[in-house]
């Protein structure tokens, strides 16, 4: 529950020695266990080469990032945002950002809207920033493109990371992970 959980009290037979008394010091004190519920996010990010050889990225080519965010926790979340800085040695492709297939306007200066962060939601609930748990359609999909600078030297590594937060729940900067590698949070 959003209130921090539910307390479950466990005690012995109330017919023996009387009813449970959590304030007393006798053998009828219940053992209390706090049941916690909270949102928990699974954030995957993959890249796809859009030009030429799908296995080789060259200078001047376009790279597409696809990020999926799912609340796999036991509680709904509100105020969920994603932030993603454009990787070094690339330029954002104007107008390429979508959330669940719907265009997201660029920042006023033409930058990616993800640089400053945007509220996200899954198609199951169109409320901005809401990610429900246990919904059948609770997977948000964010897509954007970048172009590798034409003068980038051969061997340059293009690296990028997205971060998801739900500040109302004390969740900040959970990094994305590329599920195609064994390295966590890469």
Question: Positions of the model-derived regions?
Answer:
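Exported/extracytosolic protein signature
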Residues: 1-186
């Amino acid at each position: 529950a959003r209130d921090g959980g539910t307390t479950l009290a466990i005690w012995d037979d109330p017919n023996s020695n009387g009813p449970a008394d959590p304030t007393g010091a006798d053998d009828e004190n219940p053992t209390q266990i706090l049941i916690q519920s909270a949102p928990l996010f699974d954030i995957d990010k993959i890249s796809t080469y859009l030009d030429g050889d799908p296995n080789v990225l060259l200078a001047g080519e376009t790279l597409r990032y696809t990020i999926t965010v799912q609340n796999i926790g036991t509680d709904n979340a509100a105020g969920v945002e994603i932030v993603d800085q454009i990787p070094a040695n690339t330029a954002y492709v104007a107008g390429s950002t979508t959330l669940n297939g719907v265009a997201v306007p660029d920042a006023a200066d033409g930058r990616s809207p993800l640089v400053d962060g945007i509220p996200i939601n899954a198609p199951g609930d169109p409320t901005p920033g809401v990610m429900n748990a246990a919904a059948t359609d609770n997977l948000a999909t964010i897509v954007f493109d970048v172009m590798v600078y034409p003068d980038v030297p051969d061997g340059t590594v293009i690296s990028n990371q997205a971060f998801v937060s739900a500040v109302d729940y004390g969740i900040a900067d959970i990094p994305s992970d590329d599920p195609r590698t064994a390295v966590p949070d890469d």
